[in-house]
């Protein structure tokens, strides 16, 4: 009897590397899009930005989210690209008093309270956001 065997690899430059030789972040870039595109269950993802970079989030993860509008995917994240570019339907801003967690704000991406939460907590405040926007203005 032959056993099934799946060999997952990541194209790194011009070389395919087996998943067993990859870093945690590289493993996430291989597995996360597969999970998101082939599951019809509720998926909970806890802080993916801990192991993957913003380039992967904006180029691959967001695309996977937009292709899976029928699945319920719950993210715990500090990265504003995930709810904003992923066009989250519901956002819950959690806070803690040091003992207990509680919901500070909940609503759609376009609710003022949610916009304020995203800009303050995830972006570092409106001043930080404006400074980054000014920094990225590159003359061509």
PLM segments and residue spans:
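C-terminal amphipathic alpha-helical interaction region
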Residues: 6-9, 43, 55
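Structural flexibility/helix-modulation signal
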Residues: 1-11, 15-21
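Short, glycine-/Ser/Thr-/acidic-enriched flexible segments
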Residues: 13-15, 27, 37, 49-50, ...
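Phosphate-binding P-loop
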Residues: 11, 35-37, 67
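C-terminal lobe/lid and adjacent interdomain/linker elements of RecA-like ASCE P-loop ATPase modules
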Residues: 58-140
């Amino acid at each position: 009897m032959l056993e099934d065997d799946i060999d997952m690899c990541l194209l790194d430059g011009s070389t395919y590397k087996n998943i067993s030789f990859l870093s945690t972040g590289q493993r996430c870039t291989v597995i996360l899009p597969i999970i998101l595109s082939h599951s019809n269950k509720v998926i909970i993802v806890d802080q993916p930005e801990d192991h993957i970079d913003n380039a992967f989030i904006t180029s691959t993860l967001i695309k996977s989210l937009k292709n899976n509008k029928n699945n319920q995917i719950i993210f715990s994240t500090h990265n504003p690209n995930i709810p904003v570019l992923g066009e989250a339907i519901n956002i819950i801003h959690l806070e803690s008093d040091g003992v207990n967690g509680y919901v500070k704000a909940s609503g759609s991406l376009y609710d003022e309270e949610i916009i304020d939460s995203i800009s303050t907590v995830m972006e570092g405040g409106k001043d930080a956001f404006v400074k980054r926007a000014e920094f990225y203005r590159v003359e061509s």
